[in-house]
């Protein structure tokens, strides 16, 4: 019975995330900031970058849900739950910014979510240390990616920049929390594969 309840809960969460029905526990850091004037090309570029970030948060929801579901220790399950709440903030913030820019979330969100959930399930089955190691490396790569977006976003796009900067701060904390809980270092080939997969996702999500 518990397994069925958990399955229903996960399915409900997936539907909410895919359809953008999410809630923020903290105010959007970009809300209310004055936006500078942007050309249509700059708006499209900013929207593409924020769509990539939104997809990253869709994946984060799936990863953390799966990793927390199949983690072995209660302490680690709770850590994933706490981080997932902050990641849901990011999802809500990026979706709001996309609407402000007159754009939309990725049409492939069901695919992104499903793929990430499978990856998270596999990582969790490898044991808590490797499960946390996957988080640590993911957050390290995401931090690097967000730093790149701060360089690429239009200088006058104050709202997007505020959102991305707070996301970056949160991802650093999530990675450190995973290491504090005993994350194992991921092998170099695995890191390379993760980076390659992220490259495919960011390239496609920028456009679709």
Swiss-Prot record:
Pfam families: COQ7
Topological category with respect to the lipid bilayer: Peripheral membrane protein
Top EC group: oxidoreductase
Superkingdom to which the source organism belongs: Bacteria
Recorded catalytic activity of this chain's protein: a 5-methoxy-2-methyl-3-(all-trans-polyprenyl)benzene-1,4-diol + AH2 + O2 = a 3-demethylubiquinol + A + H2O
SUPFAM superfamilies: Ferritin-like
Residues where Fe cation 1 binds: 57, 87, 90, 171
GO molecular function: 3-demethoxyubiquinol 3-hydroxylase activity; metal ion binding
Annotated residues for binding of Fe cation 2: 87, 139, 171, 174
Keyword Metal-binding applies: yes
Record localization: Cell membrane
GO biological process terms on file: ubiquinone biosynthetic process
Cofactor names: Fe cation
Record key words, sorted: Cell membrane, Iron, Membrane, Metal-binding, Monooxygenase, Oxidoreductase, Ubiquinone biosynthesis
GO cellular component: plasma membrane
UniProt cross-references to InterPro entries, sorted A to Z: COQ7_proteobact (IPR047809), Ferritin-like (IPR012347), Ferritin-like_SF (IPR009078), Ubq_synth_Coq7 (IPR011566)
Cofactor: how and how many bound: Binds 2 iron ions per subunit.
Role according to the record: Catalyzes the hydroxylation of 2-nonaprenyl-3-methyl-6-methoxy-1,4-benzoquinol during ubiquinone biosynthesis.
NCBIfam families in the cross-refs: DMQ_monoox_COQ7
Family stated for the protein in its record: Belongs to the COQ7 family.
Name of protein: 3-demethoxyubiquinol 3-hydroxylase
Taxonomic lineage from the root: Bacteria, Pseudomonadati, Pseudomonadota, Betaproteobacteria, Burkholderiales
């Amino acid at each position: 019975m518990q397994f069925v309840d958990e399955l229903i809960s996960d399915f409900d969460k997936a539907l909410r995330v895919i359809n953008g029905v999410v809630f923020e526990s903290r105010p959007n850091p970009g809300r209310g900031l004055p936006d500078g004037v942007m050309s249509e090309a700059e708006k499209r570029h900013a929207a593409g970058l924020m769509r990539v970030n939104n997809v990253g948060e869709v994946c984060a929801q799936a990863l953390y849900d799966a990793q927390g579901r199949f983690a072995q220790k209660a302490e680690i399950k709770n850590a994933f739950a706490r981080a997932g709440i902050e990641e849901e903030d990011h999802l809500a913030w990026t979706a709001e910014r996309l609407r402000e820019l007159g754009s939309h979330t990725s049409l492939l969100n069901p695919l992104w979510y499903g793929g990430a959930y499978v990856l998270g399930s596999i990582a969790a089955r490898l044991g808590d240390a490797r499960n946390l190691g996957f988080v640590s490396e993911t957050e390290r790569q995401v931090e690097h990616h967000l730093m790149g977006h701060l360089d690429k976003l239009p200088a006058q796009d104050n709202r997007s920049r505020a959102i991305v900067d707070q996301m970056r701060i949160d991802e650093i904390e999530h990675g450190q929390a995973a290491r504090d809980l005993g994350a194992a270092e991921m092998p170099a080939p695995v890191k390379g594969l993760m980076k390659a997969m992220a490259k495919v996702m960011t390239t496609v999500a920028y456009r679709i």
